[in-house]
């Protein structure tokens, strides 16, 4: 965490190796990520990026950052580390009624990240690096993974935005929603730079200038693991059907159904025996071929007969 701006400055995901052989994956650090909250005042704006915060109530799992505008007038950002990979965040104002614009009940959020390359193969990893978002009415969508998209306007209300690479994601989740007409940007990076995409999200969510109700956000920094992402919904405590597991690509519609309701369960069952990943994948492949063989048997026999009869 950084006292300048009061934001997360570096995220390391333990027990996952990166392309350089490091035992832990650094999702981002320093200038690779920027997060700024902007509040409307009676004569302009206050941006957290311009403020220095003082930490207090520091424990192994919590910290409170406070920036003082004047005596008794403060902005507070509180972080609580949840189980696994979830970080709970609340933002509130105290005694700021004379400074903040009482007619503006939203906060502008500007979030940017350069998505770092984690795998040795750039092209394949880049194909699955996408800026993904979840609509409040249900379902997810994403910006193109191959072409440049700048300030794409999302008219629907959205619950979360994910800066995703192939195996890991940084996700921002709003307790209420991010309203309408948010803008999202995804710019592919050149091979050899060490980065996959430049992501940017300009969002807006509710904020109480009186300080009576804090703005609540959750951040997920972790692997794109189907079962784990399903569990995150209960950890967010927002009471929403977040569908974070949709961050895991399961293929085209037909294959998605097969993978969702068959392959994943078989995978869980086989890994429960302690087999390594390579063995599990081989067994699943053999099992799927065995199941589909009766369906393609006639085609194989017909093809074989044609080869025999061919002059």
Regions inferred by a protein language model and the residue ranges of each:
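Soluble non-transmembrane domains of integral membrane proteins
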Residues: 2-243
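Active-site-proximal structural scaffolding
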Residues: 84, 259, 263, 306-309
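Interfacial loop/helix-cap signal at membrane boundaries in integral membrane proteins
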Residues: 222-276
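Membrane-interface amphipathic helices and adjacent TM-edge segments
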Residues: 73, 93, 210, 287-311
